[in-house]
């Protein structure tokens, strides 16, 4: 199980509604190990933790609960202006952008160059654009198709 803790339940700070410090601490009540990733915006920390727990599960040891602390930059929905957070709080978390941090890691460790990363980003944007064009030019699905490929009646 993976708990992505963005520190808010809609607009309520999580710390004000739970009686423990972190959700992963609940795991022991269910007899499963709980794991904590303090910086869920660090892709390598997340990868390394999941490499460990996936092997644990594949070895037949049962489930685990992993919690990662991260941040939701925008409101919970389009009707949520996010006024319960300060601009400073949001700006501080934006400095921890996982994509920008990982790009920096790749460049710093000479795994990829800035131009190689830009090429991957461009290819991804092009693929999304093509998918949108395909979706917009495709016929609307039929009502009957809503019931295709389901697992149970």
PLM regions and their residue ranges:
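Glycine-rich ThDP/TPP pyrophosphate-binding loop and its adjacent helix/strand module
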Residues: 1-137
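C-terminal intrinsically disordered, low-complexity extensions immediately downstream
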Residues: 137-153
């Amino acid at each position: 199980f993976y708990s992505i803790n963005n520190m808010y339940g809609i607009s309520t700070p999580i710390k004000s509604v739970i009686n423990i410090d972190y959700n992963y601490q609940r795991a022991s009540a269910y007899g499963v190990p709980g794991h904590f990733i303090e910086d869920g915006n660090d892709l390598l920390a997340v990868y390394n933790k999941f490499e460990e727990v996936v092997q644990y599960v594949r070895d037949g040891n049962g489930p685990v609960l992993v919690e990662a602390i991260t941040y939701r930059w925008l409101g919970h929905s389009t009707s949520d202006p996010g006024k319960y957070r300060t601009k400073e709080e949001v700006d501080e978390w934006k400095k921890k952008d996982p994509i920008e941090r990982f790009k920096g890691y790749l460049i710093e460790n000479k795994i990829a160059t800035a131009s190689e990363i830009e090429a991957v980003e461009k290819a991804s944007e092009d693929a999304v654009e093509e998918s949108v064009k395909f979706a917009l030019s495709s016929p609307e699905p039929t009502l009957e198709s809503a019931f295709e490929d389901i697992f149970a009646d």
